């Protein structure tokens, strides 16, 4: 999802990963509010409804990109949009983001209507709405994802197919690779993962659909656009994407990436466990100890000064930091590996 918040003038306590994630979810909820109460594939959907849905859809962005300019005003009919959705439904179903696919499976199993029990599910739900497959009823704890029976029935047949499963294995492999890359670098040009994914898919039933690969990236990861208009995937905890604008296409083979991720995990795990043990039962009600420690680790990766790290820690607690906490934080601040993308972008 496009990064919504501008953090450049904020203090570090206001731009932790937890805070930025909450702002992303609030923006997502705002996007979903005010949409038509009908999905494109429901009988009551009108052409006026279809036009409103189109404006939020991936189709609108793709059409603007192809034309290279603002689109001429035109009413998109229900029939036209339904045909566009169904034309690539088989391929798109296989190329959903991991979180979208999880929601799709649940929706199919439960007859096209599921509660969004976790606020974090709003982002993949919004992506499914942008694909014009679903709608979301209600907000907050009462939010429900609704998928028309026509699409549920079609998806049910696809989910059981061997070709679908084969593509999903590739999708999950690429998803994990991108997540590891973002944790290592902080950001990555989308062109590299897109090329890699296309090469893995070239002999499958979904070959030749670069627009669906782009949708997968937009739906599955936080992103911004660099100064040249290129898609830049960013870690959800990266507070200032501008610092990464100079990052080049850094591609690592899966084996090297796996080894680097394992090495970082071996280094960070003891730091994480030590700090977590000290924060149990002393974090503010709105944040878990696990999220608090993760916030601190991600800040350390961005070379946040020790003084600011201590202020952030204080803001997360219901008490003053103890000497043990300060010592653990100093150790974490000194030893957590910095994001390679920060140093890479500085030399451009």
PLM-predicted stretches and their roles:
Residues 66-87, 135-166, 226-246:
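Accessory beta->alpha helical hairpin/"wing" motif in late/C-terminal subdomains of nucleic-acid enzymes
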């Amino acid at each position: 999802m496009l990064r919504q918040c501008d953090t450049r003038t904020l203090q570090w306590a206001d731009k932790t990963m937890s805070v930025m994630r909450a702002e992303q979810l609030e923006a997502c909820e705002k996007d979903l509010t005010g949409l038509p109460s009908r999905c494109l594939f429901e009988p009551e959907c009108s052409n006026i409804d279809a036009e409103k849905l189109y404006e939020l859809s991936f189709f609108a962005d793709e059409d603007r990109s192809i034309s290279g300019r603002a689109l001429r005003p035109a009413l998109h009919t229900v029939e036209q949009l339904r045909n566009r959705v169904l034309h690539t439904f088989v391929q798109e179903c296989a190329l959903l983001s991991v979180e979208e696919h999880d929601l799709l499976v649940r929706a199919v199993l439960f007859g096209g209507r599921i509660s969004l029990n976790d606020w974090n599910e709003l982002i993949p739900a919004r992506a499914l709405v942008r694909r014009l497959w679903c709608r979301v009823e209600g907000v907050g704890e009462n939010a429900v994802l609704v998928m028309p029976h026509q699409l549920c029935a079609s998806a049910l047949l696809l989910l059981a197919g061997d070709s679908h499963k084969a593509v999903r294995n590739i999708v999950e492999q690429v998803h994990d690779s991108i997540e590891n890359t973002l944790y290592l670098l902080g950001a990555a040009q989308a062109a590299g993962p897109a090329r890699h994914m296309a090469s893995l898919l070239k002999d499958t039933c979904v070959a030749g659909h670069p627009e669906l690969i782009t949708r997968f990236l937009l739906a599955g990861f936080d992103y911004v656009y660099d100064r040249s208009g290129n898609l830049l995937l960013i870690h959800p905890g990266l507070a200032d994407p501008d610092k990464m604008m100079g990052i080049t296409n850094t591609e690592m083979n899966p084996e090297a990436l796996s080894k680097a991720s394992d090495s970082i995990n071996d280094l960070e795990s003891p730091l994480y466990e030590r700090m977590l043990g000290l924060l149990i039962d002393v974090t503010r009600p709105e944040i878990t100890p696990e999220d608090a420690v993760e916030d601190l680790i991600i800040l350390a990766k961005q070379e946040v000064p020790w003084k600011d790290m201590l202020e952030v820690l204080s803001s997360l607690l219901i008490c003053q930091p103890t000497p043990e906490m300060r010592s653990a934080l100093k150790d974490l601040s000194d030893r957590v590996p910095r994001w390679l993308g920060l140093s890479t972008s500085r030399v451009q």
